[in-house]
A protein has these predicted regions:
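...with weaker cross-activation on analogous glycine-rich loops/strands in unrelated enzymes
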Residues: 64-153
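Low-complexity, compositionally biased segments
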Residues: 16, 27, 34, 48, ...
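Generic ordered-secondary-structure signal
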Residues: 20-25, 30-31, 49, 103-105, ...
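Sequence-level detector for tyrosine residue identity
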Residues: 36-37, 50, 64-66, 113, ...
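N-terminal capping segments
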Residues: 1-83
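Active-site or metal-binding loop neighborhoods of secreted/extracellular toxin and effector enzymes
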Residues: 4, 14, 127, 133-182
Length: 182
């Protein structure tokens, strides 16, 4: 299969519908609200892990941890990083995609081909974005749910609010996939 070609089957549509439902349910849970907005230092970790476990699968679930932000500069921040979550697909080898721009860190990882979970964090800001993304033939990627600073969810296909944070990395990572540079 050519890396610039996506195969669309009924099971992919069903998977997307399930992700949308799960993410909406997750945002309604007080447990998630408490983890995400709590003063506990691990709130960033717990919220992201909660979403990943709910939206993921037995073969590709995520565990987040804190790590030193740009260690060579001695800076610390709330950074979400994946640990042993990459899933191999026949067409594309899904590896963790990490990018650091100035004081921001981003990554995407497979929840199960072709669905990605992308995260974004800013140094010195205890909040971040987590987004479930799913490619579409029209736009190459689709934001299924975006959990951000105000706990807002974007409607499926709402690419107008897909410009920052996890959305930026999603576009970047899919660009690499489609151009064969990954």
């Amino acid at each position: 299969m050519n890396k610039s070609t996506w195969i669309w089957e009924e099971r992919h549509d069903k998977a997307r519908e399930k992700l949308i439902k799960v993410c909406h349910e997750a945002l309604e849970k007080k447990d998630f609200q408490r983890h995400y907005y709590g003063k506990n230092k691990t709130h960033c970790n717990r919220a992201s892990e909660y979403i990943a476990k709910q939206c993921g699968s037995n073969t590709a679930w995520m565990h987040y941890k804190y790590w030193k932000w740009l260690k060579r500069k001695g800076k610390l921040g709330c950074v979400m990083t994946a640990n042993s979550i990459c899933r191999r697909a026949p067409e594309i080898v899904g590896e963790e995609i990490t990018r650091v721009d100035q004081n921001q860190a981003h990554f995407c990882a497979w929840l199960g081909y072709p669905v990605l979970l992308c995260a974004h964090a800013i140094k010195g800001n205890r909040s971040g974005h987590v987004a479930i993304v799913y490619p579409t033939p029209q736009s190459s990627f689709l934001q299924v749910c975006n959990i951000g600073w105000n706990n807002r969810i974007c409607s499926p296909g709402d690419n107008k609010s897909f410009g920052g944070g996890a959305g930026y990395l999603s576009a970047w990572s899919f660009y690499l996939l489609k151009t064969g540079d990954l």
